[in-house]
Regions:
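N-terminal Rossmann-like FAD-binding beta1-loop-alpha1 element of flavoenzymes
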Residues: 2-28
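Conserved Rossmann-like nucleotide-cofactor binding loop
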Residues: 11, 34, 263
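Glycine-rich FAD pyrophosphate-binding loop
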Residues: 20-44
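N-terminal glycine-rich dinucleotide-binding loop that anchors FAD/FMN and/or NAD(P) in oxidoreductases
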Residues: 41-65
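Mobile amphipathic helical/loop "lid" adjacent to a hydrophobic cofactor/ligand pocket
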Residues: 61-179, 183
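Conserved flavin/dinucleotide-binding core of flavoenzymes
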Residues: 96, 318-416
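Helical element adjacent to the flavin cofactor pocket in flavoenzyme catalytic cores
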Residues: 184-245
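Mid-domain catalytic core of redox enzymes
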Residues: 227-360
């Protein structure tokens, strides 16, 4: 089988690896001048800093962890602490230690803060019971919180910041986020149960190392960088890929895997079916301006609240504002710390690099489209992959890429 893959993120790379291992001929098209998608490692003064994909764990990233082992890529343990800073309320708290919960020592005698902490515990317990009973299936986060009569403080100081940080969502959009998806993610990552916390890890030397190792193991000429695909024409006998190089060129393939964002995939299809148009068109995306810098002004004001993930609210913007401490996460020099901020309110001093990442918005329409899109795999010799098939994380992208490859292999075998 001669198959084209469009997109060299984790989904496309995983599919390419599986297909070439099975003896098929693969051409992997990438519009950018580098492979990896949301893997984005910047080198600064001899230090490799990740700006996109950062962490994984053995329990919830089994396919990805196995891939790293196969490639001989080592990881190191990290911490996944979280903090919230609400300057307009002069309120800060963190999850790293007991001291972090009371980063502002005045909250030790604050009935309101103690009530908030009690509400967090109550929320986690109630969420576990509701998930088991299937009681959250049709509710948004705001509807769920109102249904269970949780206090406003829980929403503003915990639920919305956490949802915004996890999915790079604008705070104003978090209330419409499906409650079941939010709660199931927390549950699967050990946040709703009194169990051993998941052991999070980062790639030693930066995540780009695994991309480079994977690409090096592909057959020569598999990857075609700086080659944007402009149109995909399908017929009964194959697929024509129209690409832009120095000029428009065409190439013929047996099948195609679209390992891109859903909206990109829809734009590439020459004559999408009604089902493809409905499923792919259900996904919305938001762009987040992402800056690597060493400006500690983007961390919570109180050092006790500093964490790996820091949500710092800005009432003057509708965008999510999260700062990741890469020094904590990757064990990098921390004087001053290496930081990655999404949508900084002002330009950071000591800025090193900036890039824009686009993230899927998992509203109810998108979640319903996941199953519909999976059912379309194989129709018109076309397959789909990407992190939008799951929670939007690296493991989801890899799993979908492997599934698309397996389906294409099975379809080709069935044709003979």
């Amino acid at each position: 089988m001669n198959i084209a893959i469009v997109g060299s993120g984790i989904a496309g790379l995983g599919a390419a690896r599986a297909l070439t291992a099975a003896g098929h001929t693969v051409t992997l098209f990438e519009a950018a001048d580098r492979p990896g998608g949301h893997v984005y490692t910047v080198r600064h003064e001899g230090v490799a800093v990740d700006m996109g994909f950062i962490v994984c764990n053995r329990e919830r990233y089994p396919l990805f962890v196995r891939l790293l082992a196969d490639l001989g890529i080592d990881t190191r343990p990290t911490t996944m602490s979280f903090s919230v800073s609400l300057p307009h309320l002069d309120l800060e708290w963190g999850s790293e230690t007991l001291s972090s919960l009371f980063a502002d020592r005045r909250t030790l005698i604050s009935v309101r803060h103690w009530s908030f902490l009690v509400a967090v515990v109550g929320f986690l317990r109630t969420a576990r019971r509701d998930l088991d009973a299937g009681a959250t299936l049709s509710l948004s986060l705001d509807e769920y919180l109102a249904h269970r009569r949780f206090p406003t403080e829980l929403r503003e100081q915990f639920v919305i910041p956490l949802a915004a940080a996890l999915w790079s969502l604008a705070p104003d959009h978090c209330g419409a986020f499906p409650a079941e998806t939010f709660l199931r993610f927390l549950d699967q990552h050990g946040m709703l149960r009194a169990v051993r916390p998941l052991a999070w890890r980062t790639v030693i030397g930066g995540s780009q190392r695994y991309v480079d190792a994977l690409v090096a193991r592909l057959p020569p000429a598999t990857l075609r960088l700086s080659t944007p695909v402009t149109r995909i024409v399908r017929d009964a006998t194959g697929v024509t890929i129209v690409m832009r190089g120095p000029s428009l060129t065409e190439q013929r393939y047996d099948r195609v895997i679209l390992a891109t964002h859903a909206d990109t995939a829809l734009a590439l299809l020459d004559e999408p079916s009604p089902g493809e148009r409905a499923a792919l068109g259900a996904f919305r995306y938001s762009a987040n301006h992402t800056v690597l810098h060493r400006d500690p002004a983007f961390l919570p004001r109180r050092r006790a609240a500093h964490a790996s993930w820091n949500y710092v609210a800005d009432p003057n913007t509708a965008q999510v504002a999260v700062t990741y401490s890469m020094s904590r996460l990757q064990g990098l020099p921390d004087d001053p710390p290496y930081l990655v901020t999404l949508n900084p309110r002002t330009p950071p001093s000591a800025a090193i690099h900036a890039v824009s990442f686009t993230h899927p918005q998992f509203d109810r329409r998108a979640l319903l489209a996941q199953a519909a899109l999976a059912r379309l795999n194989g129709a018109n010799r076309t397959y789909y992959a990407g992190a939008h098939f799951g929670f939007g994380f690296h493991e989801d992208g890899l799993r979908s890429g492997l599934a698309a490859a397996a389906r294409a292999i099975a379809d080709e075998a069935g044709r003979r």
